Amino acid sequence: MDFDYTVTTEKSFDEAVKAVEQETKTAGFRVLYIHDVSATLKEKDFEIKPFKIIEICNAKSAHTILQADIKIGLCLPCKINVYVKDEKTYISGMKPIVLSRFFPKANLGNLPTEVDAIIRGIIDRSK
């Protein structure tokens, strides 16, 4: 099983980032922070193509997951990456369903599957 869900988009990099921001809000999640990785690396004289990490969260889901196992906080908040590779723009997110593999003793119920569907929806509607 792949740990990520990745799509290409015909949108520009900036349009894709804006779309993810909007679709995140529409899905009932919140954008916590956007890391401009390419700008951060450029400050240290390292060049990469445009790359942003968009941290997103739903407080209710996060609370439930952290109650099951506080160590799952290592995987929070959820992240959606937007990047350019080979002249194409990609939107990518980690599949929350993999959390059960990383934390097999945590009783997460259907929540990882539910959040997985929401994140896939955000990505699909953003492309």
Label every model-predicted segment:
Residues M1-V31, D124:
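Terminal, regulation- and interaction-focused segments at domain boundaries
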Residues A16, H63, S100-F102:
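Intrinsically disordered, low-complexity acidic/polar segments
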Residues T24, C75-K88, I123-K127:
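Short secondary-structure transition/capping segments
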